[in-house]
């Protein structure tokens, strides 16, 4: 087995004010979201000049991946494609085909299973190949990596770094709170009996143990949609209120569900939640996401090596392990539950 290229596949984000509404319309197409709601969310992006950090971070990650590939003696071009904004995956796969790429690995910037974490990226792969036509390259998605040692290590170190920013007298009592993006309960049951929820919970256990925390909380954030539709709970804001009522004086919030600084991190946590904590008199620290650090690039190339050389997956073994799927060819479901 060999690869001619690597495709980094991500969510996408606007890079100018005039791109914000078209981007949000792409994200919510077919979901019947009222325009007033989109305009409200658009304000979050406009607070940052209409620029999501995600595309810039991914470009920096590609540079880091290229450096790691070179360090390991690999000559593998890295392409960049998105679901919801330029560069669109359809255009990228067409360019790969035009450049003579016949077989490529695909790294999705989601560590998780479930529909939005994995199966939707498989759909992106299939759509990209369809757009490229009969000469489209074979695309092999790399596995889910929430339990890779470097994933756990990066977040554990980020928790320690965040703790160090708190007042010294509060560090030992700070409550560790992991967050991940909430999804509707109906979606949570797709692709295998609450797989996403279980994977996030397992990764939280691994990171907490690596960071030296026996106790922690795992909550959800950034829900949207009609209030009558049930989503994964508890919500991080509601949880912070409960902590305040119980006398908590400091929190470390670790956005475990995000490998980069999405708007849900820099707005929902760094602005809204931080303000809520300040109003409650709680010292607040937010752990960094992996973004484009060299260890993240090493993780990506590790996944390629596993596939190329048939190596056993590098995983942190903890109690009650949860399956990691994600690897399949040309957008096919990687588990039977996702084909239902």
From Swiss-Prot:
Gene3D superfamilies associated with the record: 3.40.50.1400
GO biological process: heme biosynthetic process
Catalytic activity, EC: 4.99.1.9
GO molecular function: ferrochelatase activity; metal ion binding
Places the protein is found: Cytoplasm
Reaction(s) this enzyme catalyzes, per UniProt: Fe-coproporphyrin III + 2 H(+) = coproporphyrin III + Fe(2+)
Positions with a binding annotation for Fe(2+): 181, 264
TM regions (residue ranges): none
Alphabetized UniProt keyword annotations: Cytoplasm, Heme biosynthesis, Iron, Lyase, Metal-binding, Porphyrin biosynthesis
Record has Cytoplasm as a keyword: yes
Pfam families: Ferrochelatase
Ligand binding (Fe-coproporphyrin III): 52, 121
NCBIfam families assigned: hemH, PRK00035.2-1
Family in the record: Belongs to the ferrochelatase family.
Main function: Involved in coproporphyrin-dependent heme b biosynthesis. Catalyzes the insertion of ferrous iron into coproporphyrin III to form Fe-coproporphyrin III.
Protein's name according to its UniProt entry: Coproporphyrin III ferrochelatase
Species this chain originates from: Mycolicibacterium smegmatis (strain ATCC 700084 / mc(2)155)
Source species taxonomy: Bacteria, Bacillati, Actinomycetota, Actinomycetes, Mycobacteriales
Gene name per UniProt: cpfC
